[in-house]
């Protein structure tokens, strides 16, 4: 079937979602790096509709602000009172000036597993079959609680959607269910919505009543069956949110593995929809990949690693690390137990080792920061080694300052670099130094007090202590040797 461009997609996002038991509107809850409604908008966007409208109601200021951020082209319609799905769609049409010529697709804002391909198939089936309305359905293993799709035995047309509580025994045996997603003829939809009544137990305008109105008027009501029944699942509570996260995560990891990524343990690996991979990446157990993280060809990440908005280049290794907004260069080595904060850039074959934290710093090719160090607001050249337990003192209590260390430098253990300060190319610094002044290229900087040994201090100040007795024993042994 050829692609059909709908005249409009209406996303229903006005509900409160009380079963989520949250101050956050239901459609704004996060799932694999995107809000529930964000997933729906992404799927709807694949249809390239002429108009994209979201109907908001509960906490509409928050929802509208979020929509403007994630889908700038979306138009919002306000449902002041939640008077049912039919009323919500009517508000959506009014936001577009009333009746719309062409196909109108209606989707729920809490169905994040719905794909663009399924919506395309719905629109194509609707047009090809000449339906007034086409409902997206699915065959499920257990239809308990769902509205059943009743079809005409001869034509296959949908004759009714029967809610579970109203279904007969034979109807309850039906496993084809209503998803709440529809494609309508825009003009017929507008006309039928004007005839929807509120004489029901909820006193609301039901969108499903439109199907009966159109059928009674002699129009055809059809169906398009989703290939995977899990796509139509709505999210109403945290349990369903967790299940949807598992399903979507599995979908994302399966796609990555089929594209040449090794995921050692998919059950403990979690990714966002915005994460990208190249071939021959290896992801170890306990890894979380978020935001715009990108893993380049042949790199290896994990175990127990969390990367957010971080790029790892080809052949790099990142182990037991937390990184946010960092860039790990080709064949670089990070971890274990490293923390890379925003603005950190690591060069070719560089190393950030065990218990090292780096922030807004760059290190050049072959440079190593192997152990127990903090590097903040610094630039380090190529092939330099930073000694263990070094601290780049960047903050004076009011402002941040920059440290520059050149190429081919060797800095001693337990150094402090008090910014702003520069260490020139090829310079050395002695262990235990506090570097407060610039070090010229090729120099050795020693900035520490001289050692002074006070003989007999322990015996005088700590008489009778274990230390004093140990020292006395050594002294007696020495006297005996004499």
UniProtKB/Swiss-Prot annotation:
Query: Low complexity bias: where?
Result: 464-473
EC identifiers of the protein: 2.7.7.23, 2.3.1.157
Q: Where on this chain does UDP-N-acetyl-alpha-D-glucosamine bind?
A: 12-15, 26, 79, 84-85, 147, 163, 178, 236, 341, 359, 374, 385
- Cofactor binding mode and count: Binds 1 Mg(2+) ion per subunit.
User: Where on this chain does acetyl-CoA bind?
Assistant: 388, 394-395, 413, 431, 448
**Enzyme class per UniProt:** transferase
Region (Linker), start-end ranges: 239-259
Which residues does the annotated region (Pyrophosphorylase) include? 1-238
Entry function: Catalyzes the last two sequential reactions in the de novo biosynthetic pathway for UDP-N-acetylglucosamine (UDP-GlcNAc). The C-terminal domain catalyzes the transfer of acetyl group from acetyl coenzyme A to glucosamine-1-phosphate (GlcN-1-P) to produce N-acetylglucosamine-1-phosphate (GlcNAc-1-P), which is converted into UDP-GlcNAc by the transfer of uridine 5-monophosphate (from uridine 5-triphosphate), a reaction catalyzed by the N-terminal domain.
Protein name in the entry: Bifunctional protein GlmU
Gene (UniProt): glmU
């Amino acid at each position: 079937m050829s692609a059909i461009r709908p005249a409009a997609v209406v996303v229903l996002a006005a509900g409160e979602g009380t079963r989520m038991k949250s101050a956050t509107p239901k459609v704004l809850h996060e799932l694999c790096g995107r809000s529930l409604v964000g997933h729906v908008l992404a799927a709807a966007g694949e249809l390239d509709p002429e108009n994209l409208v979201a109907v908001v109601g509960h906490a509409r200021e928050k929802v509208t602000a979020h929509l403007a951020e994630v889908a700038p082209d979306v138009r919002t319609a306000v449902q002041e009172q939640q008077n049912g799905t039919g009323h919500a769609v009517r508000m959506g049409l009014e936001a577009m000036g009333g009746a719309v010529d062409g196909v109108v697709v209606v989707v729920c804002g809490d169905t994040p597993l719905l794909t663009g391909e399924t919506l395309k198939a719905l629109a194509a089936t609707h047009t090809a079959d000449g339906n007034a309305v086409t409902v997206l359905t699915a065959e499920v293993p257990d239809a308990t609680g769902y509205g059943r799709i009743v079809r005409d035995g001869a034509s296959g047309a949908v004759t009714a959607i029967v809610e579970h509580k109203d279904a007969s025994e034979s109807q309850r045996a039906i496993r084809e269910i209503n998803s709440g997603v529809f494609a309508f003829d825009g003009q017929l939809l507008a006309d039928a919505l004007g005839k929807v009544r509120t004489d029901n137990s909820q006193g609301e305008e039901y969108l499903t009543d439109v199907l009966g109105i159109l059928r009674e008027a002699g129009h055809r009501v059809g169906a398009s069956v989703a290939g995977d029944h899990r796509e139509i699942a709505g999210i109403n509570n945290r349990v369903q949110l967790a299940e949807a996260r598992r399903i979507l995560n599995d979908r994302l990891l399966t796609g990555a593995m089929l594209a040449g990524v090794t995921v050692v343990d998919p059950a403990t690996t979690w990714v966002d929809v915005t994460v990208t991979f190249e071939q021959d990446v290896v992801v170890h157990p306990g890894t979380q990949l978020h935001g715009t993280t990108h893993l380049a060809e042949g790199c290896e990440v994990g175990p127990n690693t969390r990367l957010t908005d971080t790029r790892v280049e080809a052949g790099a290794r990142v182990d037991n690390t937390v990184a946010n907004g960092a860039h790990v260069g080709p064949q670089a080595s990070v971890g274990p137990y490293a923390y890379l904060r925003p603005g950190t850039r690591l060069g070719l074959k560089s190393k950030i080792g065990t218990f090292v934290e780096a922030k807004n710093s760059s290190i050049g090719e072959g440079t190593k920061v192997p152990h127990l160090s903090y590097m903040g607001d610094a630039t380090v050249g190529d092939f330099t080694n930073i000694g263990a337990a070094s601290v780049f003192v960047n903050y004076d209590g009011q402002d941040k300052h920059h440290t520059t260390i050149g190429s081919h430098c060797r800095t001693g253990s337990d150094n402090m670099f008090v910014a702003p300060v520069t260490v020139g190319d090829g310079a050395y610094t002695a262990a235990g130094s506090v570097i407060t002044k610039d070090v010229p290229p090729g120099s050795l900087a020693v900035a520490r007090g001289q050692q002074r040994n006070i003989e007999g201090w322990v015996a005088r100040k700590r008489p009778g202590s274990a230390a004093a007795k140990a020292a006395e024993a050594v002294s007696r042994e020495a006297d005996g040797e004499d």
